[in-house]
Amino acid sequence: MTEADLTGTEAVRKVALVTGASRSVGKGIACALGSAGWTVYVTGRGPVGVDGQLDRTAGIVTERGGHGIAVQCDHRDDSQIRDLFAAIAREQNGRLDMLVNNVWAAPKGFAGFTEPFWQRPFEDWDSLIGVGLRAHYVASVEAARMMVPRSTGMIVNISSFGTRGHLHSVLYGMSKAGLDKMAADMAVELRGTGVTTLSLWPGLVKNEAMLARGLDNFQGFPLADAETPEFVGRVVVALASDPDVNGRSGSTLITAEAGPEYGVVDVDGNQPISHRSVFGGGPLFGG
């Protein structure tokens, strides 16, 4: 897939919301959608209009040929999520073609997943489940209310191999497993509406924090085989461009496996490696 294949036009500009897009996977997805000519709303907790990380993401979307719109939103607050969707509906005449549920919040005092669950405070639930699962459900409800009347749309959850094997922490795995089940069950209730739900498992991602550490590998995984945030975005664009994607609704897909299926390579031309064998298998729902 070439850059030309990803480019859209103003006349057919679609509308996406990518939550948690200040950096890493969310930023990569937003930028790839920008290359495809989408209008992309990007959210984060940081202020907008001050040349912060969220503004820079929106700026890249626009530079790529899309239209980036930065919106400050604390996804722990249902009312802010509702206001966000109301603004999109008002500004885009009710149109929303894609929601990417990506926002994540670290627990209070987080310094890495270094302690077993019984040594962590109960408040971890509020971040890892409250934002990492509940906020995605709230956003999905609001998105479905916009998409179903138009008989089209896609809801994408950014999940993890932590669904399949232990990764990071108990609550992290619980939240990701919940996202996969949410996509599967939403697909059942959305059947016949034209709205597609998917969950994605990126592998090891070469994000800003990972690269800043200057590592050659992370917990045994070579960074040379890892994927960039924008690779995940290119897979999302490819799925959105598939006219038969609704037939996959409810599935969980591994990005490193979906990429070759759609002819998607990473920004450096490499093909990331799937971690399926490392975690003892693939997704429980499709894939």
Question: Residue locations for each model-derived region?
Answer:
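Canonical Rossmann dinucleotide-binding motif of NAD(H)/NADP(H)-dependent dehydrogenases/reductases
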Residues: 8-45
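Active-site loop of short-chain dehydrogenase/reductase
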Residues: 13-14, 66-67, 94-96, 147-160, ...
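Rossmann-fold cofactor-recognition segment
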Residues: 61-78
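Conserved Rossmann-fold SDR core element
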Residues: 95, 180, 190-205, 244-253
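Catalytic loop of short-chain dehydrogenase/reductase
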Residues: 105-109, 116-124, 128, 154-192, ...
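A short, exposed helix-loop element centered on a Lys and neighboring polar residues
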Residues: 140-141, 184
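C-terminal helical subdomain
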Residues: 199, 219-287
